[in-house]
Amino acid sequence: MRLLGYISFIFLLGSCGVIRNTPKFGLQDGVYQTNQENVFIETQNDTLLVFSENGVKQLNSLPLSTTSPQSNFAFQKSTFDLDVLAIPVKYRVSQSVIPAQLTSEINAALYVGKRKDYFQVIFEKNPTNRFKRKIDHYGFSVGGFVGLSNSVINSDVSQGSVPYEYQGITFSKGIAGIIAINNFTIGVAYGFDNLLDKNSSQWIYNQKPWIGLVLGLNLN
């Protein structure tokens, strides 16, 4: 289980290129909200074209580079969020004679939530007196998750009922909040674990709350 967890963690890190190219991490073609109205954005030859929502009237053209000063623009989008979460670190409160501790097993979970993304298009002047387009992005997501994880089961965490040590499989569930800033995504989870074997009633962390660090891989 521990080996499987680390393989999953490496997969998540190696998928950063996929994350950067998904619609939620870039200003892609589609309908967005502004302060005044909904608009449709389309990319043509590196230029962002802003149309009315029905695509009939062009409102603005935002080139990648220009010699003329440009106004800044802000767009936002609300979406359904489906992610695979890795929870590499959990903080467990003290139980019985065991003090509060951090555990580092890798946990995989399926996350479903509601997401809001914000994009700011600004033009920065460079030394050649050209204005280069820059897109800053940040987003928020809140939802619930379920998944499987593993935990060390031994005499210390079973009130002396289990005289041997093994890696127990647990079912995890809870809520999570995720923050995205440009290509960086991180979050916090609040959850509970259930040991999926006959020793669940003796495990001191069974159904006890924990707080974890979250890394996510966007699926949709």
How should each PLM-predicted stretch be described?
Residues Q70-T79, Y118-F140:
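Short loop/turn motifs that connect adjacent beta-strands in outer-membrane beta-barrel proteins
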Residues S94-P99, E124-K125, N154-S161, N199-W203:
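Outer-membrane beta-barrel translocator domains and adjoining extracellular loop/strand segments
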Residues S78, L102-A108, Y138, Q167-K173, ...:
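Residues that define the transmembrane beta-barrel architecture of outer-membrane proteins
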Residues R2-R92:
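N-terminal leader/presequence regions that precede the main folded/catalytic core
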Residues F80-V84, A108, Y138-G144, F184-V188, ...:
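Transmembrane beta-strands of outer-membrane beta-barrel proteins
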Residues G139-F171:
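Outer membrane beta-barrel transmembrane domains
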Residues A86-R92, K114-Y118, V146-V152, I181-N183, ...:
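Transmembrane beta-strands of outer-membrane beta-barrel pores
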Residues K24, I175, N182-N220:
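Predominantly the C-terminal beta-signal and adjacent terminal strand-loop region
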